[in-house]
Amino acid sequence: MSNYIKTDGASTVEAFVEVQLIKDGNYIVSYCPALDLSSFGNDEEDAKEGFEEALSVFFDELHKRGTLEKVLLNLGWGLRKLPVASFEPPEEKYLKKHPLNVNKTFNERLLIPVN
């Protein structure tokens, strides 16, 4: 399944994104190229939990500021207007490549309540 972001425009953002786990010294970095968003932890589970929190804060802040659409479009996402707004990820060639070796990749799907 490919990356997507959907929002009802009022209270919920649903995100499904690919996240890379990268060993960097004593830490594991969780990095999402499609959002240029990262977090880290002492182990994989800690890095995944940190990424979930970062993703939640990211969408909550964008929603509060009313800049979700603008930021996603600037990151290369495409907007489709359906009954709810749906964003398609940028093409692979536009994604930033992380300079470190990717150890593992996982998909993160979250339903994020936004205020």
Predicted regions and their residues:
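Residues within well-formed alpha-helices
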Residues: V29-Y31, D46, E53
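Short, charged, surface-exposed hinge/linker loops at domain edges
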Residues: M1-F16, E49-N115
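Short aromatic-glycine-(Arg/Gly/Cys) micro-motifs in beta-strand/loop hairpins
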Residues: A15-A34
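Short acidic, gly/pro-rich beta-turn/loop elements at beta-sheet edges
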Residues: V29-Y31, F40, H63
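A short, exposed loop/beta-hairpin motif centered on an aromatic-Gly-Thr core
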Residues: A34-D46
